[in-house]
Each structure stands twice: as C-alpha cells, then as structure tokens.
Amino acid sequence: MNNVSMRELLEAGAHFGHRTRFWNPKMSEYIFGSRNKIHIINLEKTLPMLNDVTNYVSRLAANKAKILFVGTKRAAQDSIREHAKRCGMPYVDHRWLGGMLTNYKTVRQSIFRLKELKEMKEKGLFNDMIKKEALMLTRELEKLERSLGGIENMGGLPDALFVVDVGFEHIAVEEARRLRIPVIGVVDTNNSPDNIDYVIPGNDDSMRAVDIYVRCVADAILDGKNSNTVGRVSSDSEFVEVTSNSNEEEKSGE
C-alpha cells in the first residue's frame, strides 16, 4: 500500500488529461469528464490502480527482481533518475536506444566499453595520453555514460518495465512486449492502455504528478527489499522476534 492521498494527487494536478481533441477513446473508462476542453481523469480509479502497482513491484522486489525505470521526457527525467538510484534499480532517463532490450547482447558490449573507460579514467590513464586522444576518449565516455549509465549494473534483461508516458516511450514498450516482459505504465488520456499490464491513469506531463508515481513505486520496491531482509533474519535465528505494524497544471504545446 502506498502513502499517497487523493488530495496529494489533486494538488499535483494528476487529474488533468490532455485536450479533448487529442483523446484516445480506449481511455474513456478512466475519464471523469472535461473542463475547459481538458479531459479530467478519475482519480478514484487512479488511486487503487496505483496501489495495485505498488503491491506488484513490492512482491517483485522481495524476490530480488529487477525493474527498469524508463522516463526520457523532460517532466520525468529527474524523478526517474533520483528514485531509481534511491531504490537501487536500473533506469533510462536520456534516450531509449533501439534494441536496448531486444538486442541486449550488443548493448552489453557497449556497457563493457563504458566500464573499461571509467576504469581507465579512475586509474589516471587519460593523463598519460596526448591531449587529442584523451579528449576523444573523454567524449566517448560521456556519451556512453549519458545513454547507458543507468543500466550499467543491470546485469541482464529486467523482470519488468516501469514507464512514464507509454506513448512517448512506445519503442521501449514494444520491445518489452516482444520479450514478454511485464509493463507498468503511466497512461494519459491521449494514449492507449492496450498492452500495458499495470496501468496508472494519470497526468504524465506534470513534474509533480510524475514524481508522486515514481516515488510511490520506489518506496514500494524498498519495502519489498526490506521485507525480504526481515524474512531472512527471522528464519536464520529462532531467537529473533519480528513484529510489523500492520494547483492546476494546464497542458501546453498542443
């Protein structure tokens, strides 16, 4: 169960969808109505669905599963990076490279190269090179770090994807579907919930709203990891007793 309230979602503008002329009819069951030609998302459906997502990722994390956070649009980048790091999960916050999942063997070679360059820099080997060569390697390192730094330690394909804006990240969603990797997605009124295993109907353009979704998922992952740790401690020692207590943001640029 997440700690977010209906009031918090409202204050973050999570209920504001896109302009009515851009709507996707497949999202009709999640739409409460419209105001000033903006669709209003029914948060009474969003909140329990967000709870379903947090319960799901908590179970995954308890089983040491890897959940890849994906959010490359401006409204999502900072939250995706911050909260994925906080809960120890891989992330993509810059640009989704085609084949990042479906051609992972090739991507892994680039990750090896990234680690090699980082090790060279840490050992000060760049300082022993001529200026031009050191500059070229530095630029290569920066480029690889920007595109692959978040999945550097993923160690294989993820067990699930958590995506902010399934339309913007449609390539990532398509690759996951091809590999039968479950997809958790924030879906706004202009996109389709089809092929999304766990839907979070909500505003995907508000930074405050996006931060709430991502924070809730990260918190649930940490809870799952902690429950796994508690379970191991209690099973390892019969002497350990474990107790548990049970502003409106209008869309722009359309």
UniProtKB/Swiss-Prot annotation:
Designated name of the protein: Small ribosomal subunit protein uS2
UniProt superkingdom: Bacteria
UniProt similarity note: Belongs to the universal ribosomal protein uS2 family.
HAMAP family: Ribosomal_uS2_B (MF_00291_B)
GO biological process terms, semicolon-separated: translation
PANTHER family to which the protein is assigned, alphabetical: 30S RIBOSOMAL PROTEIN S2 PROKARYOTIC AND ORGANELLAR, SMALL RIBOSOMAL SUBUNIT PROTEIN US2M
Keywords annotated in UniProt: Ribonucleoprotein, Ribosomal protein
One GO CC term, this protein: cytosolic small ribosomal subunit
Pfam families per the UniProt record, alphabetical: Ribosomal_S2
Presence of keyword Ribonucleoprotein: yes
Statement: the UniProt record of this protein carries the keyword Ribonucleoprotein: yes
CDD domains: RPS2
Source organism (scientific name): Legionella pneumophila (strain Corby)
Region forming the signal peptide: none
Listed GO MF terms: structural constituent of ribosome
